[in-house]
UniProtKB/Swiss-Prot annotation:
Ion transport in keyword set: no
GO molecular function, one term: NAD(P)H dehydrogenase (quinone) activity
The reaction(s) this protein catalyses: a quinone + NADH + H(+) = a quinol + NAD(+); a quinone + NADPH + H(+) = a quinol + NADP(+)
NCBIfam families reported for this sequence: flav_wrbA, PRK03767.1
Ligand binding (NAD(+)): 12
Enzyme's top EC category: oxidoreductase
Similarity comment: family membership: Belongs to the WrbA family.
Annotated Flavodoxin-like domain residues: 4-199
Cofactor requirements of the protein: FMN
Binding residue positions for FMN: 10-15, 87-89, 122-128, 143
Protein name per Swiss-Prot or TrEMBL: NAD(P)H dehydrogenase (quinone)
GO cellular component: membrane
Length: 209
């Protein structure tokens, strides 16, 4: 059995929807055990309320929150980790950064060496830092000793020119629009499923399971 966990942060639900699609793709692989977790929120509730995020976060309130006590089982215990984060100035969110910065003990034990790592993201605009967010995230995964997997061009949907779409060789992405009203398209969700399946198949081969 190959164990794959999806770890995400979402404020308005875009990354959550992508995470569910990634998980669905991973579950298509025979013998895959797939989990999905959200990272802890660091913003005060009054700030979230002003940002209009209280109601939207209820959409995925049923998803378990990854606590520090769970890091050993959920993160170090997985064969592959697929991370999802919105862009923040071309980087991951502070909420996701806080989780990764807390992995020093596991890093010191080489707990992630040889595991598969992959990333997906969202931004408000077509050129809102999607690629830089994934690439800068990759730097952390390399420091952890992980094997990077992206979204290869065998997934032809990323080359479509007839509609606005996210996605690059670095990983699948979605474009939320300046007001957040655009939800992930079927094309983007299909790419997310592809990436989830692709990562899981590679992790299964590496783990010899």
């Amino acid at each position: 059995m190959v164990k794959v966990n999806i770890i995400f942060y979402s404020m308005y639900g875009h990354v959550y929807r992508m995470a569910e699609a990634v998980a669905a793709g991973a579950r298509e692989v025979e013998g895959a055990e797939v989990g999905i977790y959200q990272v802890p929120e660091t913003l005060p509730e009054e700030v979230l309320e002003k940002m209009g995020a209280i109601e939207t976060k209820k959409l995925f309130a049923h998803i378990p929150v990854l606590t520090r006590e769970m890091n050993e089982e959920v993160l170090a215990g997985a064969d592959a980790l697929i991370f999802g984060t919105p862009t923040r100035y071309g980087n991951m969110t502070a909420q996701m950064r806080a989780v990764l910065d807390g992995l020093g003990g596991l890093w010191n034990r080489d707990a992630f060496v040889g595991k598969v790592g992959s990333v997906f993201t969202s931004s408000g605009t077509q050129h809102g830092g999607q690629e830089s967010t994934i690439l800068t995230f990759h730097v952390t995964l390399l420091h952890l000793g992980m094997i990077l997997v992206g979204l290869p061009y065998s997934e032809k949907r990323q080359t479509r020119m007839d509609e606005i779409t996210g996605g690059s060789p670095y990983g699948v992405s979605t474009i939320a629009g300046g007001d957040g009203s655009r939800q992930p398209s079927e094309n983007e969700l299909a790419m997310a499923r592809y990436q989830g399946r692709h990562v899981t198949l590679i992790a299964k081969k590496i783990a010899g399971k």
